[in-house]
Swiss-Prot record:
CDD domains registered for this protein in UniProt: FN3
Sequence positions bearing Phosphotyrosine: Y765
GO cellular component: membrane
Name used for this protein in its record: Cytokine receptor common subunit beta
Coiled-coil portions: none
Glycosylation site positions: N62, N141, N350
Residue ranges, Extracellular side: 23-441
Length: 896
């Protein structure tokens, strides 16, 4: 009975002690692996967990992560460079780890349980007999009072109900220890007493020092109980034998003798951050194991161990007198919802360029559930900047983003990450791989403006100087074009060489030139030659050679057609055409312009070889094999070119000389009715100009020929009879009737009895007979009679080759170009004399010194002619150029 009462009081005492310890009781702390554990899944096929252990515990213990859905399964983990989703406690140095758990059974109702276990079995066990493990209660209300000669230390102890308590005042005694404050308790002084107070004499203390004392209850030596004393007010910590530091140690349990079993143990302080221990007990060997709670941790002191406490209730000490107590690793865990812990794989980032802008595109990992929506976070920056200074854009349900306001010629970097939204949650995925690109170079606006201004100014300068240069080049080019109007030789339009009166004489003496043709000739005579400077061309031409006109049989008197001056062209006697002999169409010269050009491109035969016998009827049949191609004097002829300087200024005497020359030659005069009108045109127009025809009649209607654009040798002017041909070139200076030199041609008449001439072989040349040249050599005022030694071509006899009075005995009359102008070659001061060099019958070379300077009296109404050059000239523009046609290889014996 007494023992039962003592047990009851002991339990009550233990309960009171537990209540007294309640203020220091705390729950076991979470370990570092449990604090840092975070797990996220892709909600498809795997779970990724990240946690960390302390660096101090690495050499003592190795922790393993366990995943439990139906049963616990260890998870393989590996060291990682960083702690992914949590932070390491500041009081520890962490070692991060990363675990990948293959898992596909995701559901919104699943709760995954994660825990940690050490790789070795940790724990201890103890059998506790109550009577032999009694620890008396701790003294309470310890106080000290001073007096004059002593210090009184008092305390109290509650033993509870004496009927149930195993302890009595006889079973306990007190131990008092005191020391200086800075001393250790191992060096403290102690004393034993059975009273609840003790007196300290002053001699026990050092003056001016602070002492500390503590009291504890212990079993008296005469008690039947055994155990140990109660705890000191301040606990004493001492070192134990060496051993495994990771193992918990110094497990002690003391029954208070009432109803509580107080247990304590110690853990190496460096392992307390990684491993948590708990106290487990069994009241009997067959009873289930239970966990002691709460576990109290003493504040860490100078000791290297950390002490833990836990009190076990002992409701029936007599029934359960032996407890099994153990300290084991305390397994801790927490629940994580999978659908709220999703981390997706990083997206794949690409970039496209759209004209002047750039666009980012990305693709995400395909998930098991396609209805899960995503949000994206895009960052882009200059390559030289840090990501903290980057621009960040958050986009929901988008897979592209346009980039604007990018600087040209700059390198940029971009990255993107993703996480689920809506009913699912998680964390951001890792950043995608950085995509780097460089923007195109764009010219700044200011540069464009400056370049445009520069180009405009440059273009204006180029246009300015270009126009000046082109204008100068044009003027130089134009100045290089031969333009006779710039020379004093052609200030009068060439009237000194071909006066209008001579042309009028041709028109008046030719009955065929009546009507529109005569008016046309008169108009041409009256016009000034100012048109020679541009592209205007002479409208004068001849009739079509296909129309053969026969001169009338009656007498023909031709009055002068010019009002200013008249000149009668000497009659040229020709034989009438044979009525029964057909007329052959003759080639003609092209007078379509101011220059003389041939209608065909082959050389002409010599004149003497083409002369034929006249017909019986007195008509001359010209039969030329081809048209004139060059104006050449016949080689070997005796015709001479008379210097005009010897015959200038003689007035009407030259007309008489021309007539007398013809009479003296012995050739009979030709009747006026038989004289065909003679007209020479010195202008030649290109084929594309519009010609105006001038009809030339041969006398009779049967002898009429078609008017054309050519002057043919078959015309009466250029048709040579069998008799000698007399030509007189003389100016009529001083007389109003003849103001310019005239060309006097006399065609001797062949007797009717003479045989008809064959086809002339040299009809394409104009020959000057010696009589004309001799007449020209006569001094002024004393005309010498012409020498009747002109050669006459007799049919059947070989013709003697006589050279013309040309500077070139070859007979070729070639113009000489000096600068921009053309002259008769060899024209210069002095008299013109015939060459004594023997002529070459088949070579026409360039002539030298052909014409001498002429001094002509200048009248008020017309400029003085300067030289017997070409009558008309034009500026070389457009088609008006003087060119030589190609040589005819068939006429290899002649140059012309």
């Amino acid at each position: 009975m007494d023992q039962q009462m003592a047990l009851t009081w002991g339990l009550c005492y233990m309960a009171l002690v537990a209540l007294c310890w309640g203020h220091g009781v705390t729950e076991a702390e979470e370990t570092v692996p449990l604090k840092t554990l975070q797990c996220y899944n892709d909600y498809t096929n795997h779970i990724i967990c990240s946690w960390a252990d302390t660096e101090d515990a690495q050499g003592l213990i190795n922790m393993t992560l366990y995943h439990q859905l139906e049963k616990k399964q260890p998870v393989s983990c590996e060291l990682s460079e960083e702690l992914m989703w949590s932070e390491c406690p500041s009081s520890h140095r962490c070692v991060p780890r990363r675990c990948v758990i293959p898992y596909t059974r995701f559901s919104i109702t699943n709760e995954d349980y994660y825990s940690f276990r050490p790789d070795s079995d940790l724990g201890i066990q103890l059998m506790v007999p109550l009577a032999q493990n009694v620890q008396p209660p701790l003294p309470k209300n310890v106080s000290i009072s001073s007096s004059e000669d002593r210090f009184l230390l008092e305390w109290s102890v509650s033993l509870g109900d004496a009927q149930v308590s195993w302890l009595s005042s006889k079973d306990i005694e007190f131990e008092v220890a005191y020391k200086r404050l800075q001393d250790s308790w191992e060096d403290a002084y102690s004393l034993h007493t059975s009273k609840f107070q003790v007196n300290f004499e002053p001699k026990l203390f050092l003056p001016n020092s602070i002492y500390a004392a503590r009291v504890r209850t212990r079993l008296s030596p005469g008690s039947s109980l055994s155990g140990r004393p109660s705890r000191w007010s301040p606990e004493v910590h001492w070192d134990s034998q060496p051993g495994d530091k990771a193992q918990p140690q110094n497990l002690q349990c003391f029954f208070d003798g009432i109803q509580s079993l107080h247990c304590s143990w110690e853990v190496w302080t460096q392992t307390t951050g990684s491993v948590s221990f708990g106290l487990f007990y069994r009241p009997s060997p067959v009873a289930p194991e239970e966990k002691c709670s709460p576990v109290v941790k003493e504040p860490p002191g100078a000791s290297v161990y950390t002490r833990y406490h836990c009190s076990l209730p002992v409701p029936e000490p007599s029934a359960h007198s032996q407890y099994t107590v153990s300290v084991k690793h305390l397994e801790q865990g927490k629940f994580i919802m999978s659908y709220n812990h999703i981390q997706m794989e990083p997206p794949t980032l690409n970039l496209t360029k759209n004209r002047d802008s750039y666009s980012l595109h990305w693709e995400t990992q395909k998930m098991a559930y396609s209805f899960i929506e995503h949000t994206f976070q895009v960052q882009y920056k200059k390559k030289s900047d840090s990501w903290e200074d980057s621009k960040t854009e958050n986009l929901d349900r988008a897979h592209s983003m346009d980039l604007s306001q990018l600087e040209p010629d700059t390198s940029y970097c971009a990255r993107v990450r993703v996480k689920p939204i809506s009913n699912y949650d998680g964390i951001w995925s890792k950043w995608s791989e950085e995509y780097t690109w460089k923007t195109d170079w764009v010219m700044p606006t200011l540069w464009i403006v400056l370049i445009l201004v520069f180009l405009i100014l440059t273009l204006l300068l180029i246009l300015r100087f270009g126009c000046v240069s082109v204008y100068r080049t044009y003027r130089k080019w134009k100045e290089k074009i031969p333009n006779p109007s710039k020379s004093l030789l052609f200030q009068d339009g060439g009237k000194g060489l071909w006066p209008p009166g001579s042309m009028a004489a041709f028109a008046t003496k030719n009955p065929a030139l009546q009507g529109p043709q005569s008016r046309l000739l008169a108009e041409q005579q009256g016009e000034s030659y100012a048109h020679l400077e541009d592209n205007n061309v002479s409208p004068l031409t001849i009739e079509d050679p296909n129309i053969i006109r026969v001169p009338p049989s009656g007498p023909d008197t031709t009055p002068a057609a010019s009002s200013e001056s008249t000149e009668q062209l000497p009659n040229v006697q020709v034989e009438g055409p044979t009525p029964n002999r057909p007329r052959k169409q003759l080639p003609s010269f092209d007078f379509n312009g101011p220059y003389l050009g041939p209608p065909q491109s082959h050389s002409l035969p010599d004149l003497p070889d083409q002369l034929g016998s006249p017909q019986v009827g007195g008509s001359l049949k010209p039969a030329l094999p081809g048209s004139l191609e060059y104006m050449c004097l016949p080689p070997g002829g005796q015709a001479q070119l008379v210097p005009l300087s010897q015959v200038m200024g003689q007035g009407q005497a030259m007309d008489v000389q021309c007539g007398s020359s013809l009479e003296t030659s012995g050739s009979p005069s030709v009747e006026p009715k038989e004289n065909p009108p003679v007209e020479l045109s010195m202008e030649e127009q290109e084929a594309r100009d519009n010609p105006v025809t001038l009809p030339i009649s041969s006398g009779g209607p049967e002898g009429s020929m078609m008017a054309s654009d050519y002057v043919t040798p078959g015309d009466p002017v250029l048709t040579l009879p069998t008799g000698p041909l007399s030509t007189s070139l003389g100016p009529s200076l001083g007389l109003p009737s003849a103001q310019s030199p005239s060309l006097c041609l006399k065609l001797p008449r062949v007797p009717s009895g003479s045989p008809a001439l064959g086809p002339p072989g040299f009809e394409d040349y104009v020959e000057l007979p010696p009589s004309v040249s001799q007449a020209a050599k006569s001094p002024p005022g004393h005309p010498a009679p012409p020498v009747a030694s002109s050669p006459t071509v007799i049919p059947g006899e070989p013709r003697e080759e006589v050279g013309p009075a040309s500077p070139h005995p070859e007979g070729l009359l070639v113009l000489q170009q000096v600068g921009d102008y053309c002259f008769l070659p060899g024209l210069g001061p002095g008299s013109l004399s015939p060459h004594s060099k023997p002529p070459s019958p088949s070579l026409c070379s360039e002539t030298e010194d052909l014409v001498q300077d002429l001094s002509v009296k200048k009248f008020p109404y017309q400029p003085m002619p300067q030289a017997p050059a070409i009558q008309f000239f034009k500026s070389l523009k457009h088609q008006d150029y003087l060119s030589l046609p190609p040589w005819d290889n068939s006429q290899s014996g002649k140059v012309c």
